[in-house]
């Protein structure tokens, strides 16, 4: 799972395009329970257009919905639950 995403992010040069070092994966996809969607956490907001580009690339290539959240925009209680199964995919 994590390796698939990492290879995908490297292939599409996502880390450089978004100017980020890592992308968090959480939820059911991170736990390997089912693959109904992919939840991604970004440490900083790359802007609307870049978020939408990432979302469309993930959805097109994995054929499932993708949700993207920004870490500093989450309520602390939500971040607590996100952190329980958060895995980071590192790009550089």
Segment roles from a protein language model:
Residues 1-25, 30-35, 43-92:
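Catalytic core of pol beta-like nucleotidyltransferases
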């Amino acid at each position: 799972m994590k390796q698939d995403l990492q290879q995908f992010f490297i292939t599409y040069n996502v880390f450089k395009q978004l100017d980020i070092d890592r992308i968090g994966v959480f939820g059911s996809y991170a736990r390997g329970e089912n693959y109904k969607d992919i939840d991604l956490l970004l440490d900083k907001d790359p802007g609307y257009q870049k978020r939408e580009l990432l979302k469309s690339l993930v959805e097109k290539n994995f054929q499932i919905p993708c949700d993207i959240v920004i870490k500093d925009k989450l309520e602390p209680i939500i971040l607590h639950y996100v952190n329980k199964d958060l895995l980071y995919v590192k790009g550089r």
